[in-house]
Amino acid sequence: MRNLLSAHFARLWRSGWFWVGALVMIWFSWIGVDSTRNMLNYGEPASVLDFTLFYVQPLSIALPVFAAVFLNGDYYYGTIRNKLATGRSRTAIYLADLVLIFLVGLIYSLAFLSINLGLGLSLAGAPQTDFLPSWNDILQGLPVSLAVALGIAALSVLLARLVTHRTVPLTALFLGMLLTFAAQWIDQILLIPTELPVYDEAILMVDDSGEPVKGYRKDGVDYTPEDCPKEPNPNCVGEPIHALLTFAQNFSPMGQAYQLSRNSVGTLSASPAPPGVLAAFALGFTAVATGTGLLVFRRKDLK
Amino acid sequence: MRNLLSANFSRLWRSAWFWLCGLGMLGYTLWEVSQLYAFRAHALTVWEVERADFATPRVGDCSLLLLIAMAVLCPLFLNSDFHDGTIRNKLVVGRTRAQVYLANYLTMLAAALLYTLLYEAVLLLAIGFTVPENLWNAQAVTIKLVGLMPFILSVAALFTLLVQLVRSRGVTVLSILLMVLLLWLPRQQFDRLCEPEEKTLLGGAEVFVEVDETGEPHQFYWRDGQRISEEDLETVPNPRYLAPPQRRLYTFLLNFLPGGQAFQLSDSIDVEGGSGPLMAAYGLLLSMLATGAGLLAFRRMDLK
């Protein structure tokens, strides 16, 4: 196993794709810093900490693509046969790949965080107010994000090892994008409220402190959004589907990444699972993906 | 050269990637037509317009998807020359590297033109047969179609350059990254160009929106329990406002690079100082530069 890892690392530093992936992570981090700087310029509440845990989202695309390009070289150049011929077991090869891809994921995360925190704190800042994430939120979220990164690494190795065709990087890219869009779409569905207010017109009311707030008028009576009579929302999804979608959002690494990064900007996510639960799902996914990958890889005809 | 083109085209018709990208283009065209129908219904019922020019604003809308299609097709189609080793066969039978490069460029150019033809044919026929309210402006439509040609030349040249010089099977990923960069950069640059010279400081004021009797929304400001107007707010120079030298650079890049041209051709952004003839000239220039550089580099490349 040590020889396999040593061979991987020797190839890693010389691989252009590794540096391209790191640049992509740095680019995404810079977008977050620039966006924060822009919002602060206009006096809007913003913080670079909004984007700190966001790193898992570009990682969920960059890491599978990198793994696909890097590990596919074993099939393309036939080096996998050399590894097996020298007595390495398929399990050892697969696990060495998983360790490598997870470590690459950590390096990519560090690249992202160095721009986000290193450059971001000096160029933009991290104001601490009620609606912005605190350092405590970030410290709690970081271990969870590492578990999610492990899940992403497991998915990447599963795809890269089971698909031998040279177009696997494209498959990895499309799968990453598809699952990320699916996570956004599921979140939108889960956000549909179960009840809707019944009213004749929306009005502007003045509350006790003299501030204008949104209200509803029905049959001549003014209500606040909380007091207004409500009816069931016909667009809301029924129970078996709702539970299924919630499970899918929690089990998929892209769904976990979405919840993690959305959690850091407040309760925008429909179903933010508590950090411990999210981490457990991430580790569960890792176990299932790795177990499946090992089972199939051991029986696979490697020609 | 004729043999090379004939071999390339016979491979193109049998290539699944060519048909898949074509299917994507068709799907986008049909979506565009459905959006047109929705817009037409809205214009006729809500705005009570009797006739309007629906065709001219939509003729250039294929530019964005063409950029994406070329970014996907070029590497998937051309890279197999390296992967299957057919490039060696072409050189062994006496073809020059320049001929191989140009044949590949012309094949990708033909694919791009076919995709554009598909889009324009479906769009214009749909309007012609199913939108009797359309006011045809043949001159404007022709000018837009002619303006698309240098753009197509430059996009095909740029992606052929990339794919011919990168032998690795991961060139598809690089190509898609380039396409994402070409599409992301113009929006960033345009947003910066739109930044005002001065910005308003709220100074503790809150912003609210009210709707008057005619249904028009109006913004008003509230500070210390009092309603104030926009003139009462302080203005300071905007640090994100671009100074003239940088403005000129950003405007140049928006007009020169295919990404910015794609957005302008599809009327998504309106760049000050951008015009059809200028973009056409830049498109021709970029295609010549990319092809020239590609030919030079390809001749020196170690093909192993």
Predicted regions: what is each one?
Chain B
Residues 76-110:
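Helix-loop-helix units of permease transmembrane domains in multi-pass membrane transporters
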